């Protein structure tokens, strides 16, 4: 009997192995909605976790695996290291001649030298605990205050440090900081939308079947967003803010950016609302692969302040393990795949040859 079961067990083990490896070896031939195309721009970028434009031709890339910030010329594929020796960099912001760098547990400010290198580093914040997750993207509000995304140390727990599972505000000069929003399990990125406010992604707990969905949230200063009390029976705990958008559980919604009105990619007109695009890494926590896609999120304003609804659709799929994305000044979309050595893709309207 055992001899007959061995081939079946071996097949199941093989299928599970293929399932785990699939996202890391896929993504080179993504699918996209009709009328648009995806093209490979560059390879061997390490473990890309952020994309920031220095200008129209040079893209700065956080390489988590290499512990560095790389400058990539998207026209020639020439590249150079602007800063190395970092511990898992996940975020970068260019602001007033300085580079604000987010790495695991630490936020630092560097002067940008005439040759573009990052020099004379100053630690703004340090000592943020890391565990299951770490500190992620850093962005900025119109008043100059930084927004720093800080992940939880665990799947579900009560954090010992209130700076975990939170969005933090940080003074870009002094490093003074505090909690801007709590109950945010693992928010990777966010984007400021003029005349509206800050929208951010968040990824819920694992190992609970179809609960909870990944989220798009609207930031209200001082608000709580539910974790770790968001049980299946109370998905939006009393006193917490509900998400404005929900997506497939355990798929990891990460980088997010605002579609410019001049972009050729589909989206709402200003009179209708606005459109965000986000990268969905994909799940290791499901039997079958889910995620591995780029989403279009149409956002509509309600009649009440801070009241938003969304319509979310897949735009690119079979995309491997995308993490960061950003719109180019010309309106085309760029995203990077974390697995497979790190690849950069661009998305634009298909060339009809006319």
Where are these regions (language model features)?
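Hydrophobic membrane-insertion alpha-helices, especially the h-region
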Residues: 6-20
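Beta-propeller domain segments
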Residues: 22-32, 135, 152-156, 165, ...
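A short beta-strand motif characteristic of beta-propeller blades
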Residues: 38-43, 78-83, 122-128, 176-180, ...
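Beta-rich, blade/repeat-based domains predominating
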Residues: 44-57, 84-104, 128-146, 182-197, ...
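Residue-level marker for isolated small/hydroxyl-bearing positions within beta-strands
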Residues: 54, 62, 102-104, 149-151, ...
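Beta-propeller domains
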Residues: 60-75
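Loop/turn residues immediately N-terminal
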Residues: 66-67, 105-108, 340-342
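Asp-box/WD-like beta-propeller blade repeats and closely related beta-sheet repeat scaffolds
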Residues: 105-141, 151-152
């Amino acid at each position: 009997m055992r001899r007959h079961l061995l081939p079946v067990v071996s097949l199941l083990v093989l299928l599970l192995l293929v399932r785990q490896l699939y996202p890391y070896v896929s993504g080179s031939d993504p699918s996209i909605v009709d009328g648009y195309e995806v093209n490979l721009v560059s390879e061997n970028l390490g473990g890309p976790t952020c994309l920031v434009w220095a200008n129209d031709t040079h893209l700065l890339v956080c390489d988590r695996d290499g512990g560095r910030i790389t400058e990539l010329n998207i026209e020639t594929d020439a590249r150079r290291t602007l800063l190395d020796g970092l511990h898992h960099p996940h975020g970068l912001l260019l602001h007033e001649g300085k580079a604000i760098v987010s790495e695991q547990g630490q936020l630092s400010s560097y002067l940008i030298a005439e040759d573009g290198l990052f020099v004379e580093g100053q630690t703004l914040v340090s000592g943020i605990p890391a565990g299951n997750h770490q500190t992620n993207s850093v962005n900025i509000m119109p008043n100059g205050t930084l927004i720093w995304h800080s992940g939880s140390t665990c799947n579900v727990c009560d954090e010992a440090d209130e700076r975990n599972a939170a969005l933090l505000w940080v003074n870009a000069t002094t490093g003074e900081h505090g909690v801007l929003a709590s109950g945010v399990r693992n928010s990777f990125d966010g984007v400021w939308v003029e005349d509206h406010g800050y929208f951010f992604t968040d990824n819920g707990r694992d190992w609970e079947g179809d609960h909870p969905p990944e989220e798009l949230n609207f930031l209200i200063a001082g608000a709580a967003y539910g974790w770790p009390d968001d049980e299946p029976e109370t998905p939006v705990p009393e006193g917490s803010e509900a998400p404005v958008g929900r997506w497939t559980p355990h798929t990891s919604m990460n980088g997010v950016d605002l579609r410019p009105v001049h972009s050729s990619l589909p989206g709402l007109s200003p009179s209708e609302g606005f459109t965000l695009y986000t990268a969905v890494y994909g799940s290791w926590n499901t039997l079958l692969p889910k995620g591995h896609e780029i989403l279009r999120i149409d956002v509509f304003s309600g009649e009440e302040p801070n009241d938003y609804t969304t319509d979310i659709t897949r735009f690119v799929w079979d995309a491997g393990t995308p993490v960061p994305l950003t719109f180019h000044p010309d309106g085309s979309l760029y995203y990077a795949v974390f697995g497979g050595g790190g690849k950069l893709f661009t998305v634009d309207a298909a060339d009809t040859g006319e």
